[in-house]
Swiss-Prot record:
It comes from Botryotinia fuckeliana (strain B05.10). It comes from the Eukaryota. InterPro entries: DEAD/DEAH_box_helicase_dom, Helicase_ATP-bd, Helicase_C-like, P-loop_NTPase, RNA-helicase_DEAD-box_CS, RNA_helicase_DEAD_Q_motif. This is ATP-dependent RNA helicase dhh1. Residues 78-248 form the Helicase ATP-binding domain. Residues 504-517 have a biased composition (Gly residues). GO terms for cellular component: P-body. Residues 456-500 have a biased composition (Low complexity). Residues 258-418 form the Helicase C-terminal domain. CDD domains: DEADc_DDX6, SF2_C_DEAD. A motif (Q motif) lies at residues 47-75. The keyword Calcium does not apply. Residues 432-455 have a biased composition (Polar residues).
């Protein structure tokens, strides 16, 4: 009997038809992004994420994030970061730097240890929200808790959150120093110290705070610095605080290959009319329009609305809850155009943005580089248009020289193959809903409208009302969201006009528009502009 059982056991083969890749079958992988990509992200060594010998649970998060193969910066940084060595990494905007430090951080964290083990510093609140969402999505199968904290929010909520296990803190330096200084955030076992947009974090306004934060970390911590530009302040910090850092420099050229740059000479009083002409002629999926001051941001947003286009705006003087809401809604495609200051030049990744317009030309090359990097993300196509006044001509020349790039005069017709894809509906949206606060992000009666491509920008009526009223207009009427954003129902397609980009009437102080609506308040109880009534019958 025993011999018979032994014979049967020897003949038994364990085979559940499993294959090495079978575990991928149950993953919730988003649709493949079929858009053309440039060498900024395709010039790799041919590695796969599996080649890094990371946990399967982390691989599951990577593939469910929509990643297929590592980009050049990820190929270079991830293996080194996994060894615990300090890193100085320089790579272009929009080439995957965030995942290059988040993936090794998630791999090295011990979920059973309830102490903070990784600190990720970023310069802006919006970038903190975005980075924390990447951490949560990539680490969703690991049981790792991520906390985001920034200035402008209540300290009480952060204190309560830190009473629970937190493995990664993502935030701005001032708030984290405040928490550490009050002995609320225990960084004694935080072995990973990461700075994204390191050049900004090591500017004079942040340097002292960064130096103080380092005192709360163990001496054998790992420091990783990532940025597109490395000024002398970064070298000074590295020499003082980093041990034999591994240097990565993938900046063979400063600008992204997929971005086409143009300029148009425009008198100040004609800029709004020029912008109107661009809207009518360009095939915009989403656009970001930059101004050099917060006052001009609000004024331009109101003028764009008077012209009949849906528009949000955002700047540093706004209430934090309103900034979060605008960022969340624009990221999810509720509106086509965003007017902002340099608040959103750092790290913000919105795949659907294919046009960046510098309504006000920046004063230096670094700001220009980060602005235009909001389009053409992850090797895709983008368009940057600069409205140049007579006073800007020397800045234009200096920026071209410093960046080693060419900004060409704008042609009468911009070929669509420079910045337009045939199927914009396939452009990836955020993997998960960017809920920063349930009460802020879930207004009733709101339509989540995905922008679609048209021959010109979508024109809608606009009237400034209360942002939070959540009312929806009937067909052909205006839907408005006053605090920082205006949007309309009943789109009217603009078929384009025979105009030059830099000629015509209208100015920043008085663009064309239809009937004027009631004057109401905008953000922060500031004085609002005149709304645009329904367009007159043609």
């Amino acid at each position: 009997m025993a011999d018979e059982l032994a014979t049967k056991l020897a003949a038994t083969q364990i085979n559940d038809n499993a294959s090495p890749d079978n575990w991928k079958a149950g993953l919730n992988i988003p649709a493949k992004d079929t858009r053309q990509q440039t060498e900024d992200v395709t010039a790799t060594k041919g590695l796969e994420f599996e080649d890094f010998s990371i946990k399967r649970e982390l691989l599951m998060g990577i593939f469910e994030m929509g990643y297929e193969k590592p980009s050049p910066i990820q190929e270079e940084a991830i293996p080194v970061a996994l060894t615990g060595r300090d890193i100085l990494a320089r790579a272009k905007n929009g080439t995957g730097k965030t995942a290059a430090f988040v993936i090794p951080a998630l791999e090295r964290i011990n979920p059973k240890n309830t102490k903070v083990q990784c600190l990720i510093l970023v310069p802006t609140r919006e970038l903190a929200l975005q980075t924390s969402q990447v951490c949560k999505t990539l680490g969703q199968h690991l049981g790792i808790n991520v906390m985001v904290t920034t200035g402008g929010t209540t300290l009480r909520d952060d204190i309560l959150r830190l009473q629970e296990p937190v493995h990664i803190i993502v935030g701005t330096p001032g708030r984290i120093l405040d928490l550490a200084g009050k002995n609320v955030a225990d960084l004694s076992e935080c072995n990973m110290f990461v700075m994204d947009e390191a050049d900004k974090l090591l500017s004079p306004e942040f340097t002292i705070v960064i130096e103080q934060l380092l005192q709360f970390h163990p001496k054998d911590r790992q420091i990783m610095l990532f940025s597109a530009t490395f000024p002398m302040t970064v070298k000074d910090f590295s020499d003082k605080n980093m041990a034999d850092p591994y240097e990565i420099n993938l900046m063979d050229e400063l600008t992204l290959r997929g971005i086409t740059q143009f300029y148009a000479f425009v008198e100040e009083k004609e800029k709004v009319h020029c912008l109107n002409t661009l809207f009518s002629k360009l095939q915009i999926n989403q656009s970001i329009i930059f101004c050099n001051s917060t006052n001009r941001v609000e004024l331009l947003a109101k003028k764009i609305t008077e012209l009949g286009y849906s528009c949000f705006y955002s700047h540093a003087r706004m209430i934090q809850a309103n900034r979060n809401r605008v960022f969340h809604d624009f990221r999810n495609g509720v509106c086509r155009n965003l007017v902002c200051s340099d608040l959103l030049t750092r790290g913000i990744d919105i795949q659907a943005v294919n046009v960046v317009i510098n309504f006000d030309f920046p004063k230096n090359a670094e700001t220009y580089l980060h602005r235009i990097g909001r389009s053409g993300r992850f090797g895709h196509l983008g368009l940057a248009i600069n409205l140049i006044s007579w006073e800007d001509r020397f800045n234009l020349y200096n920026i071209e020289r410093e960046l080693g790039t060419e900004i060409a005069p704008i042609p009468q017709i911009i070929p669509k193959n420079l910045y337009v894809y045939e199927t914009p509906e396939n452009i990836p949206r955020p993997v998960s809903n960017f809920q920063t606060n349930t009460r802020q992000a879930s207004g009733p009666g709101r339509d989540q409208q995905q922008p679609t491509q048209h021959s010109g920008n979508q024109r809608t009526g606009g009237q400034y009302n209360n942002y939070n009223n959540g009312r929806q207009s009937g067909p052909g009427q205006n839907q408005s969201q006053g605090q920082g954003q205006v949007q309309g129902q009943g789109p009217r397609q603009n078929q384009g006009q025979r105009q030059n980009y830099s000629r015509g009437r209208g100015g920043f102080g008085g663009g064309r528009g239809g009937g004027q609506g009631p004057r109401q308040n905008g953000y922060d109880n500031s004085r609002g502009g005149r709304g645009q009534g329904p367009p007159p019958a043609q």
